[in-house]
Amino acid sequence: MATKFGDDFTVGDVLDAGRITVTETHVVNWAGLTGDFYPLHMDKEYAAQTRFGERLAHGPMIFALAVGRVALSGVGGDAAIAWLGADNLQMIAPVRIGDTISVTVEVRE
């Protein structure tokens, strides 16, 4: 994707930042990095007894993976000086190990 800067975007633009498959390695590394070893993420037997039936990925990790996809997509190049936030972030479903997430960004203003 060609690098775009502020004036190159139009309200309503939807940018495809690609896909990534969540792996066991992602979950284990995230737990070690953050100290979040909650059993729903780490304990297969515990997770099997929950309404989800299996382990889930950490929600903040999914957000971080999405941010990584946006960064690697080339949108903005090296122009981003600071991360100023995300509005209306939605986690629409649980993410399991082996799931592939698709990342899109919509220009709102």
Task: Please place each PLM-identified region on the residue numbering.
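Hydrophobic beta-strand-centered segment that forms part of the acyl-chain substrate-binding groove
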Residues: 48-57, 61-108
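Catalytic strand-loop segment that frames the active site of acyl-thioester-processing enzymes
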Residues: 1-57
